[in-house]
């Protein structure tokens, strides 16, 4: 399948490259993934055949980011900032609002907004846990959206459940798309009445007992009970 050549993607907070892999699967050219966890580099580059840049996003300058995009390409900037400050687990185990506010990780969303403002990519995408929507009274997310709109972006967002799109798992995520050109119509559910089950997804795998590894695939194993 032909690559979509007009656009180039840079993936901030890329980790091992799940979002990058999705863009590559949809035929986009991903120029580079950026993360400050260097242990992700091998998996990222091996699985995606894309360059990994070991860099703290808070220290990435606008000029450095612009140089990551090939010349004469339309820029897509994506980022999934760490979700721990906004997660249900953190809410349940940390009721101290002041302590939550001091967690520097949530401020990474502001660093992301700074880079968007400074480089003006044509398209922006962001994904995080649904709790981000109401974190700190909604201020963090609302600030992010307001800065995008102030910079001329049409912003669309919503909370989506992976099971509604053919994934055999209940996993809700807040997804945001922003464009300089027009408002995105977010994809409606495709599997509302015909969810894919775990049995359908992995039922073809051979049975193994607890504590065993598959002879054919060392990544397929069952923990000892």
Positions of predicted regions on the chain:
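Core alpha/beta nucleotide-donor-binding catalytic domains of modification enzymes
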Residues: 2-120, 130-133, 139-141
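S-adenosyl-L-methionine-dependent DNA methyltransferase catalytic core
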Residues: 2-10, 14-28, 147-150, 173-225
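Generic beta-strand hydrophobic packing signal
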Residues: 31-33, 124, 158, 205
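Glycine-rich, flexible loop/turn motifs
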Residues: 53, 82, 156, 161-163, ...
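Short, solvent-exposed coil/turn elements at secondary-structure transition points
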Residues: 58, 161-163, 208
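Short catalytic/ligand-binding loop motif for oxyanion handling, primarily in non-cytosolic enzymes
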Residues: 84-88, 132-135, 166-169, 183-186
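Conserved Class I SAM-dependent methyltransferase catalytic core
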Residues: 105-169, 174-178
